[in-house]
């Protein structure tokens, strides 16, 4: 999975897909009551990027629905995963439950269309800190109450704050979640980051019977040397400001027979097992 990073304006969606991304990450900004308002990162953000691009959240969902609905004139078959970077750290943890209800409801109304020809992409809920775990409970509760639990099959969970992996597992156990789990490891592209935690996450993913990590990705990679380093370790995905650079690296002899771009036929919730 090549994840285009900080794709917050509607016009950037096709721009990043044209560069080779098959997944996009966008920031979801909330008001003080936990209502998702905009796709917006704000200042500071990654080096060399404009931090202020934004869209109204529901309008953004309407657009990506079209891009991921077969038969729609805007359909792009390569876009298979949407990662929502939920800016819950900007609001009180007490509002995490309200935020979960709001995001689930807006996805039902504007993306899935409650079963009426909605978008088909997989959804990854990127949660910054384990203390905001009530967001997940609220999201699942809302799908159940609205009679649309079938969409759980399309939704995964990912804690992105580089917290202790065992603490993350404990929170997932508390929630009763042991599938559809990704694990991110990374830092803003402005700073270097070692591989110690990334290696631990990959080790857990590859431990037979370990349920709490099915995919691991590294973010936000801009240098080809760091992309190569991550691929050598065996990541499932790379988040980058430059998807075309990742495409180029994947074509190199060292990687071209080991990796390929994920398509809609690839299940993002299953561990990859080499043949």
UniProtKB/Swiss-Prot annotation:
GO terms for cellular component: extracellular region. InterPro entries: PLC-like_Pdiesterase_TIM-brl. Mg(2+) binds at residues 25, 27, 85. GO terms for molecular function: lyase activity; metal ion binding; phosphoric diester hydrolase activity; toxin activity. Its EC number is 4.6.1.-. One of its GO terms (biological process) is lipid catabolic process. It is found in: Secreted. It comes from the Eukaryota. Its cofactor is Mg(2+). Binds 1 Mg(2+) ion per subunit. Expressed by the venom gland. Disulfide bonds join 45-51, 47-190. The active site is at 5, 41 (nucleophile). Its main location: secreted. It catalyses: an N-(acyl)-sphingosylphosphocholine = an N-(acyl)-sphingosyl-1,3-cyclic phosphate + choline; an N-(acyl)-sphingosylphosphoethanolamine = an N-(acyl)-sphingosyl-1,3-cyclic phosphate + ethanolamine; a 1-acyl-sn-glycero-3-phosphocholine = a 1-acyl-sn-glycero-2,3-cyclic phosphate + choline; a 1-acyl-sn-glycero-3-phosphoethanolamine = a 1-acyl-sn-glycero-2,3-cyclic phosphate + ethanolamine. Gene3D superfamilies: Phosphatidylinositol (PI) phosphodiesterase. Keywords: Cytolysis, Dermonecrotic toxin, Disulfide bond, Hemolysis, Lipid degradation, Lipid metabolism, Lyase, Magnesium, Metal-binding, Secreted, Toxin. Dermonecrotic toxins cleave the phosphodiester linkage between the phosphate and headgroup of certain phospholipids (sphingolipid and lysolipid substrates), forming an alcohol (often choline) and a cyclic phosphate. This toxin acts on sphingomyelin (SM). It may also act on ceramide phosphoethanolamine (CPE), lysophosphatidylcholine (LPC) and lysophosphatidylethanolamine (LPE), but not on lysophosphatidylserine (LPS), and lysophosphatidylglycerol (LPG). It acts by transphosphatidylation, releasing exclusively cyclic phosphate products as second products. Belongs to the arthropod phospholipase D family. Class II subfamily. This is Dermonecrotic toxin SpeSicTox-betaIIA2i. It comes from Sicarius peruensis.
């Amino acid at each position: 999975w090549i994840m285009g990073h900080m794709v917050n304006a509607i016009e950037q969606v096709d721009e990043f897909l044209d560069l080779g991304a098959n997944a996009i990450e966008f920031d979801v900004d909330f008001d003080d009551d936990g209502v998702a308002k905009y796709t917006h990162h704000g200042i500071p953000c990654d080096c060399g990027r404009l931090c202020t691009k934004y869209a109204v959240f529901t309008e953004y969902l309407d657009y990506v629905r079209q891009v991921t609905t077969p038969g729609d004139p805007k359909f792009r078959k390569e876009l298979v995963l949407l990662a929502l970077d939920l800016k819950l750290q900007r609001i009180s943890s007490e509002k995490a439950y309200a935020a979960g209800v709001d995001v689930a409801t807006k996805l039902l109304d504007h993306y899935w269309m409650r079963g009426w020809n909605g978008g088909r992409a997989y959804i990854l809920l990127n949660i910054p800190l384990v203390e905001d775990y009530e967001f997940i409970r609220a999201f699942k509760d809302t799908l159940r109450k609205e009679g649309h639990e079938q969409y759980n099959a399309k939704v995964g969970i990912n804690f992105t704050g580089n917290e202790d992996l065992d603490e993350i597992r404990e929170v997932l156990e508390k929630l009763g979640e042991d599938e559809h789990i990704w694990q991110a490891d990374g830092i803003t592209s402005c700073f270097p980051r070692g591989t110690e935690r990334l290696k631990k996450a990959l080790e857990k993913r590859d431990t037979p019977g370990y349920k709490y990590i099915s995919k691991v990705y590294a973010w936000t990679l801009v240098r080809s040397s760091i992309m190569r380093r991550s691929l050598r370790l065996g990541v499932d995905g790379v988040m980058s400001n430059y998807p075309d650079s990742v495409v180029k690296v994947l074509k190199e002899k060292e990687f071209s027979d080991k990796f390929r771009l994920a398509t809609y036929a690839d299940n993002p919730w299953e561990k990859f097992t080499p043949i």
